[in-house]
Amino acid sequence: MYSLGIDIGGTKCAVILGKGELCENTDGFIIDKIKFPTDVKRGWKAVLNEILEKGDELLSRNNIKSTELIGVGISCGGPLNSKKGTINCPPNLPDWDNVPIVKIVREHFGVRCVLHNDANACAVAEWRFGAGKGYNNLVFLTFGTGMGAGLILDGRLYCGTNDCAGEVGHIRLAENGPVGYGKAGSFEGFCSGGGIKNLAQMTAKKYLEENKVSLLFKTQEDIEKLDAKIVAEAMYQGDTFAKEVYTKCAEYLGRGLSVIIDILNPEAVVIGSIYERNQEFFLPIIKDVIKKEALSFNAEVCEILPAKLGDSIGDFAALGVLF
């Protein structure tokens, strides 16, 4: 038996063929994959038709019938309704309003279909296949373009009353600060790709006003070119400004983690993307903050781990929601 996964994003989509049962080793679990750009201008029907066509192509070229599938898993940015099986106009998919994707996909392939938002699906992926294997209480933080969480509580994915559990990005950690989730000083404002960019630009303006020096900028035009990747590279080259930006980001990551640790009491928090690439810098700082901010008996039982699946997480996420 086999599994089929659909990963829908604002810039690209992927259809993934996997094995039909969990295995200890992830090597070989994914059998084949087709990815293609998401042409949102064509509208949701055209994009979804292309997804279904690519799914058929994937099965055909691997000599697999749809009757051999255990199901189809779908991962997509929210808002969505996993119980009703609808996608409800995510920001990067503007005309996907109340699209009954589960019904359409189920009828096309004739098998069960499961839909979850991407943060939840990634949490399941790291829990089933990655750094979270073996834990019953786990929080996954995206820490990429945005900041969201997926929650595995008592050995099950927890979605909340209306699929909005884990929306940690909007939590305000400071009265002022970079804007994320439309809110100044939010978790996402300090701890996301866009947030680090905003934090860097705010800090750089102060540097110019105070006549401080950085390798990265001399003018306002230079400041506007700053982003999370550029600043990270400069940090590893010893730039004081870049280190200040990432230190502040790490401190607020520690504050956000302290809130999560005390509210949910998890065994582990798995953090993806930016943390995954910069763990050695972040970890000592966030440990110091957690030691000060979180209850000691909660902090002591919680591990902070980098995500393990890397760029493949979207593939495992789409397939993982089936298991």
Residue ranges with predicted function:
Residues G85-W96:
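A charged helix-plus-loop insertion that forms the helical arch/lid used to bind
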Residues I152-L153, L157-Y158:
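Catalytic-core segment of enzymes that process non-peptidic bonds
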